[in-house]
Amino acid sequence: MGEEQQKPEELNAPTDDAPQEKQQPADLSSETEKAKSKKKQELSEKDQVVKIQAWWRGTLVRRSLLHAALSAWIIQCWWRLILPKIMEKRRQSMLDTFQQEQWAVVRLQSWIRMWRIRRRYCRLLKAVRTIQSHWRGHTCSSRGVIKGQYRISTSQMHLELEVLLGSGPCIVTECIPLPIKQ
């Protein structure tokens, strides 16, 4: 009986040949399967973590893009609101400048017209005084004798002067337009 018992033990006992090889791969395969499943689980957890991180980063980027788009939209609305006011101010400024330039031109033209009329009036006044002084008989013997007459119509003065100096008379006839404001 001892031998019989030994034989089954010997059969069950590990030998250097086949039985050890069969047990080791079974142990190794189960260990590798466990390791693989553990790695898969770790990888799947890593993948899930990466996916969550990617989703969160995407959410942050979308949020910042939405914020930027909203800010741009607000600025565009403000600009559309303020642009007509700026254009109206610019138009009003240009109108004011044009009005000032026109006023300056009209004022300058008025001064020039006034100066020309005043100059014409002063010439006329001088001629009238000369005629009046000589008409009244205030003649100077050294200058000679001045005789003259004038006629005033609605728009001009007709002047005829005769100056007697030396040998012969000098006759001056002139029509002077009168400065009439319209």
UniProtKB/Swiss-Prot annotation:
Gene3D superfamilies: 1.20.5.190. It comes from the Eukaryota. Residues 1-43 are annotated as: Disordered. The keyword S-adenosyl-L-methionine does not apply. Disruption phenotype: Homozygote Iqcf1 mice are significantly less fertile because of reduced sperm motility and acrosome reaction. Keywords: Cytoplasmic vesicle, Repeat. Transmembrane segments: none annotated. GO terms for biological process: positive regulation of acrosome reaction; positive regulation of flagellated sperm motility involved in capacitation. InterPro entries: IQ_motif_EF-hand-BS, IQCF, P-loop_NTPase. GO terms for molecular function: calmodulin binding. GO terms for cellular component: acrosomal vesicle. Residues 45-74, 101-130 form the IQ domain. Residues 1-10, 31-43 have a biased composition (Basic and acidic residues). Specifically expressed in testes and mature spermatozoa (at protein level). It is found in: Cytoplasmic vesicle, Secretory vesicle, Acrosome. Involved in sperm capacitation and acrosome reaction. Interacts with calmodulin. This is IQ domain-containing protein F1. The lineage of its organism: Eukaryota, Metazoa, Chordata, Craniata, Vertebrata.
